[in-house]
Amino acid sequence: MKYPKLVFDVSFDERARFEAKSRGYLSNVYVQQSDGSMYPVVFYDCIRLAQDLEYEVSTGRMCVADIGMIILPEVTLECIKIAVKKLTDEGYFKRVVPRGD
């Protein structure tokens, strides 16, 4: 099996891929490393992140914070795979806490 591996809580079929790209957001995803450790990740594109921040500011919260937030130019499977591979190669996942079961 090739690592890092993407693990989706729900099927990431053609429709889900279209919806993620359209929304600019994807959650309920984990990155599994070769040692079996799983890291929760959330993907945003810049437009969706700006919209969410604008909303949060309007409510007085003043921030957007998600564990494992990764910002992409667009939320596509191709961009997700490239980003996760690069982050793994750079040691990103060694510096964050894996999901506890």
Feature-to-residue mapping (PLM):
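Short helix/strand-capping turn motifs
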Residues: 1-95
